[in-house]
Amino acid sequence: MNVFGQIVDYKSSFTRSHSFSVAEKVTKMARFYGYDESTVERMYIAGVLHDIGKMAVSNDILEKPAKLSETEFAYMQTHAWYTYVILSQINGFEDITEWASLHHEKLNGSGYPFGKTGKDMSEKDRLVACVDIYQALSEDRPYKKGMDHAKCMSIMRDMASRGLIDARITEDIDKKLSGEKRSENRHK
């Protein structure tokens, strides 16, 4: 699985370690929640592969150094659908497919690719989504500098207060990840 994560991460210089950072943090949180080791390992795989659909997205979009247009953003959003399409072809990956492909869903139904609501999302779906947000906020991207833990948590708490992401998982991320330094993915 790691080779697929490496391919995804190396597709764009600005997400060079994103998939593995998500996988590592998802693993820490899964252990924090006391999931059995088999589930922890499967969640790690979901973290590594959650952006595999970006292989279908042009690097011109992935590395654009400015805000995406509405059309470009809609195109970028297709990566979550392609993650679902790719992973759903693998027998025995049903749970991994769900956790990986729902990482942009929001509890109020405003997310993508399926517009699921909180009642349709498991705790593990919500966990991968929250960790992906945390990781994305902490990383440098073509259009922004990475944020420190306190700023990431402020944004995530705001999102939780608006019913977008799970408030309990957000607070648990603060407890478990507060001592970690910002992402090593720095670009000067």
Q: Where do the PLM segments sit?
A:
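Histidine- and acidic-residue-rich, metal-dependent catalytic cores
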Residues: 1-188
